[in-house]
C-alpha cells in the first residue's frame, strides 16, 4: 500500500518542485526526502499525544503571552472558532504544572457546558504522563468524556489543584477562596467579575476572560472596552473599505488595546488566526451579513449601538494640554 501523508494545516508537505529536486539527486536525495516525511509524521504524532509540549502555537498566542506578563486581567475576545479557549486551557495547565500548590478556578455557563466545552480542553493539555496517575492522598486526576473530571476537580502531583464552577450556581461558591488564576469563559456576568477580582488579591493572581460577544455590548464588554486605548490594529479582509471602529484606519479592526486601568489588557483573536479552522467556511457563512455580524463573528468585536451623542469620539481625539 502506498504511503499516504497525514494532512496538517501547519506542517506543510514539500512542494512538487522540491520533491523533483530531491529525485534528481538519486538515492541519496530520495533517502533525505523519506526522512523529511518521517520527521513530519513524528511531529504530527507528538502533537496528538502531547499537545501541551508539542502543540503548535500561532503568533497571536505569543502576543497574548506578552500582554499577560504585564497584566492582572486579560480579556480575549474572539471570532467563532478563533482558538481563544484552546489558549486559555493551555494557560491553565501552564499555571498548574509550573507552580507548586497553585490554585485555579475554571468558570463556564453551566455544568453541562463545562463538561462539553472546557473540561475536554483542559484534559487535552494535561501532560501525557499525568493523565493516568495512580490516585494517592495528594494526586488525583480522574476524567471521562461523559462526566468530565470527578467531582469537578483534579490535583496534580505537585499539589496544584483546579476546580470547575459555573454561573448557574449561586455566587457564594466563589466567596472566600484565594486563587492564582481564574479563567472565566463565555458571557460571564459583570457581578461575577467584580467579585472574582477579590479572590485574586492574596496570591497576586490573574484573571483571564474569554468569549465571543454574541450578546453584543453587554455590561461585561463595556467594563473592559469603554474608555480603552487601541494599541494595535490588523487588516480586516472581510471589511476592507471603511473605518470599522473609531481609532482604526480604513480596513482594519482592533487587535490589542489597554483598558481604563493600565493593568487591564485586551486582545482580539480573529477567526482567520486559527489555522485549524478553515476561514473559507466562515467567509461563506458571513456572505451577505451586516458589518455588525461580521465584526462580531469573524473579529470578536461588539459594537456599541446605543445612541451616543458623539459616536465616533474615542481616545485618538484626546490631546494633552500642551497640544
Task: List the model feature ranges, each with a label.
Residues 2-323:
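Phosphate/NTP-binding elements of NTP-utilizing enzymes
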Amino acid at each position: 500500500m502506498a504511503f499516504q501523508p497525514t494532512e496538517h494545516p501547519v506542517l506543510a508537505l514539500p512542494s512538487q518542485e522540491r520533491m523533483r529536486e530531491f529525485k534528481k539527486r538519486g538515492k541519496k536525495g530520495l533517502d533525505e526526502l523519506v526522512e523529511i516525511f518521517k520527521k513530519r509524521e513524528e511531529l504530527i504524532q507528538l502533537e496528538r499525544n502531547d499537545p501541551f509540549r508539542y502543540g503548535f502555537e500561532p503568533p497571536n498566542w505569543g502576543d497574548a503571552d506578552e500582554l499577560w506578563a504585564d497584566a492582572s486581567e486579560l480579556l480575549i475576545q474572539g471570532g467563532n472558532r478563533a482558538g481563544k479557549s484552546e489558549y486559555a486551557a493551555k494557560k491553565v495547565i501552564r499555571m498548574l504544572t509550573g507552580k507548586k500548590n497553585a490554585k485555579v478556578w475554571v468558570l463556564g455557563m453551566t455544568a453541562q457546558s463545562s463538561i462539553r466545552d472546557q473540561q475536554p480542553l483542559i484534559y487535552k493539555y494535561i501532560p501525557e504522563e499525568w493523565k493516568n496517575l495512580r490516585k494517592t492522598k495528594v494526586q488525583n486526576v480522574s476524567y471521562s468524556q461523559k462526566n468530565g473530571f470527578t467531582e469537578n476537580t483534579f490535583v496534580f502531583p505537585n499539589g496544584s489543584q483546579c476546580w470547575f464552577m459555573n454561573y448557574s450556581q449561586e455566587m457564594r461558591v466563589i466567596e472566600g477562596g484565594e486563587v492564582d488564576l481564574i479563567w472565566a469563559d463565555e458571557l460571564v456576568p459583570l457581578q461575577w467579575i467584580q467579585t472574582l477580582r477579590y479572590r485574586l488579591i492574596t496570591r497576586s493572581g490573574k484573571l483571564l476572560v474569554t468569549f465571543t460577544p454574541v450578546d453584543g455590548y453587554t455590561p461585561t464588554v463595556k467594563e473592559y472596552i469603554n474608555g480603552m486605548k487601541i494599541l494595535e490594529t490588523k487588516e480586516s479582509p472581510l471589511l476592507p473599505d471603511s473605518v470599522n471602529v473609531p481609532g482604526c484606519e480604513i480596513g482594519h479592526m482592533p487587535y490589542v488595546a489597554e483598558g481604563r486601568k493600565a493593568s487591564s489588557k485586551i486582545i482580539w483573536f480573529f477567526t482567520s488566526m486559527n489555522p485549524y479552522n478553515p476561514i473559507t467556511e466562515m467567509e461563506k457563512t458571513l456572505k451577505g451579513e451586516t458589518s455588525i455580524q461580521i465584526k462580531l463573528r469573524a473579529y470578536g468585536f461588539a459594537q456599541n449601538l446605543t445612541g451616543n451623542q458623539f459616536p465616533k469620539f474615542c481616545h485618538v481625539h484626546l490631546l494633552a494640554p500642551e497640544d
